[in-house]
A protein has these predicted regions:
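N-terminal secretory signal peptides that target proteins for export/translocation
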Residues: 1-2
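Sequence/structural signature of beta-propeller domains
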Residues: 17-247
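Sec-dependent N-terminal signal peptides
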Residues: 5-14
């Protein structure tokens, strides 16, 4: 079922990161889809950018069309909190909260889940641990945690590259999306009902309020469709498509 809404979002024009394309400006329009997926907690685009890939707390990975239809890809029972794709080979990476691990689903069949590395700094966080994984570049991923709003960079072989906290402006990291065009990170904070835009080294650029989204735990910037996809982990899982303008 598709519901269409118009809302007034207070969107400010914000400058781009580094010397890349500017950060998009959010518009008034959004749509919401009810999705057949329990506890949606991670989103990214597939390799061809023809659909979304999604993961859920119950350990499922699905392909979701841009109109909300879901198709099963993989299930393991692990507490999946974040999903991202390596664009060079199509491998899927998953953030597993209970064990604080990053797992891999090798392309193209996605029928085997293997351990990549442990996030040792989050080993004591339990159910307040890692919530997001996001491919950056040169075989480096970002990993974000709920507790402490920690942001780590890891090589995919498990080597820690850097560690910072976004706690100056965020109460948690519920989801991450790296926008290559602007060289910026988008960060969802479900507790504050906000989405932040910051540089890759954690300098805040701006923020957007999303009071109409109950529990934003998944986030994907889609420049081809000029929108932001936001997954909300509610009683009935919802996928929001929020329009933006490329500046």
């Amino acid at each position: 079922m598709v519901n269409k809404f118009l809302v007034l979002l207070s969107a400010l024009l914000i400058s781009g990161c580094a010397e890349k394309l500017p950060v998009p400006q959010l518009r008034e329009n959004y749509m919401v889809y009810e999705v057949d997926m329990a506890e949606l907690s991670g989103l990214c685009l597939n390799k061809d950018k023809t659909a979304l890939l999604a993961c859920g707390d119950t350990g499922t990975v699905k392909s979701i069309s841009f109109t909300g239809e879901a198709e099963d890809l993989w299930a393991s029972g692990a507490d999946m909190e974040g999903i991202t794709l390596n664009p060079s080979n199509g491998d899927i990476y998953l953030a597993i909260e209970g064990t604080q691990e990053i797992h891999r689903l090798p392309a193209t069949t996605y029928n085997q889940q293997v351990l990549m590395f442990d996030v040792n700094d989050a080993s004591a966080f339990k159910n307040s641990g890692i919530e997001a994984v996001e491919y950056y570049k040169k075989n480096i991923v970002f990993v974000g945690s709920q507790k402490g709003a920690n942001l780590w960079q890891y090589k995919i072989n498990g080597t820690l590259v850097s560690s910072i906290s976004l706690s100056d402006f965020a109460s948690e990291i519920a989801a991450l999306c790296y926008d290559e065009a602007s060289d910026c990170l988008w960060v969802a904070d479900s507790k504050l009902a906000k989405i932040f835009v910051c540089t890759v080294d954690g300098q805040l650029i701006d923020s957007y309020d999303f009071p109409f989204i109950e529990n934003a735990e998944a986030l994907c910037v889609d420049r081809d469709r000029k929108c932001l996809w936001i997954g909300s982990d509610e009683a009935a899982t919802k996928l929001y498509k929020v329009d933006f303008d490329s500046i």
